[in-house]
Amino acid sequence: MTDESSVRTPKALPDGVSQATVGVRGGMLRSGFEETAEAMYLTSGYVYGSAAVAEKSFAGELDHYVYSRYGNPTVSVFEERLRLIEGAPAAFATASGMAAVFTSLGALLGAGDRLVAARSLFGSCFVVCSEILPRWGVQTVFVDGDDLSQWERALSVPTQAVFFETPSNPMQSLVDIAAVTELAHAAGAKVVLDNVFATPLLQQGFPLGVDVVVYSGTKHIDGQGRVLGGAILGDREYIDGPVQKLMRHTGPAMSAFNAWVLLKGLETLAIRVQHSNASAQRIAEFLNGHPSVRWVRYPYLPSHPQYDLAKRQMSGGGTVVTFALDCPEDVAKQRAFEVLDKMRLIDISNNLGDAKSLVTHPATTTHRAMGPEGRAAIGLGDGVVRISVGLEDTDDLIADIDRALS
């Protein structure tokens, strides 16, 4: 029997391999048993050969795991694989996507600091920026993310951090990543990009100058709606410094089990995103000509107001389609509920990036916490519907949507 005490470092991947290949093979470590699948290290703590080794491990003088809230071998493999896919210097896994968002900003901001954020955000991200960070003494200034002149005005004074989603959830508004990053850096700010809608397969922020990228691993990375998880990617100094300190002492750590599940998700991420992206494009085109639909927001539709920007900074429109029903606003909620309830294949759920196609009414679910004024400011009315396109046959999905709209 092979000695299981040793860890085998895998052969280095050849230069120039694709993200799909990295997703399957990147960062893998094998124990002495030479298993084909990554090992799942379900342990809370670790033992030391001597008290001196324990002391040096806690002092950071030895490369030794000390406690799974600080680090775990399975979690480390997940971090390394995602880092390689993204092309980032370093990565840190978190318990959820919102833990990643909060930690990434908390590691940059303190009392008296200034944050400039796009107004069109996921509901919980909006609450973090508008309510929670201000309790720490952080000033948050919101701008319309698709209006570069507003970014210019907001970043004309010293600022510590910038935060945005692009495409935004659910309105699919885009931020010109390169232009805003240039403005932010001139103002002294670090740029945090929430890349959950695009995934690293369709958009990469680091080549465009961003400092930090965050993900909800719960979405496309898992891809089957099984576990929660998140990740923060940035330079080594940022990850090993303020991010690690905040994570270590506040505790939103990823579990080894969740990391193992997410590793399985990374293996199929490229092929899933490719299929769902192509399917979403067809569904968006179908909805764009439907008589019951007022407008469709999908970055790779020529009718999208920022279509040219989408083509520049994305390699696909993504897996999410947002549309508004063509009906009076006073009956829009009722009409939207009727449409959702009539779908027979597509499930009503607030998640996205799943193998199963999912539909939600953002105003009463994911963005309820924004309140009526916050939703109105980003154009999110009661007739807006968001579909996360999964892996089912595209024709079957279109038939289901058409039936629900009839």
UniProtKB/Swiss-Prot annotation:
**Residues where N6-(pyridoxal phosphate)lysine is found:** K219
> What is its cofactor?
pyridoxal 5'-phosphate
Top-rank taxon of the source lineage equals Bacteria
A Gene Ontology term for the protein's cellular component: cytoplasm
Entry's Gene Ontology BP terms: 'de novo' L-methionine biosynthetic process; homocysteine biosynthetic process; transsulfuration
Q: Single GO molecular-function term? A: carbon-sulfur lyase activity
Q: What is the main EC category here? A: transferase
Q: Write out the entry's keywords from A to Z.
A: Amino-acid biosynthesis, Methionine biosynthesis, Pyridoxal phosphate, Transferase
Could you tell me what reaction this enzyme catalyses? Answer: O-succinyl-L-homoserine + hydrogen sulfide = L-homocysteine + succinate
The residues the entry assigns to the signal sequence are: none
Query: Could you tell me what the cofactor note in this record states?
Result: Binds 1 pyridoxal phosphate per subunit.
Annotated pathway? Amino-acid biosynthesis; L-methionine biosynthesis via de novo pathway; L-homocysteine from O-succinyl-L-homoserine: step 1/1
Q: Which EC numbers characterise this protein's activity in its record?
A: 2.5.1.-
Is Amino-acid biosynthesis set as a keyword in this record?
A: yes
Subunit info here reads: Homotetramer.
Task: Tell me the function of this protein.
Answer: Catalyzes the formation of L-homocysteine from O-succinyl-L-homoserine (OSHS) and hydrogen sulfide.
Xref: HAMAP family = MetZ
Name of the protein this chain belongs to: O-succinylhomoserine sulfhydrylase
Q: Which organism is it from?
A: Mycobacterium tuberculosis (strain ATCC 25618 / H37Rv)
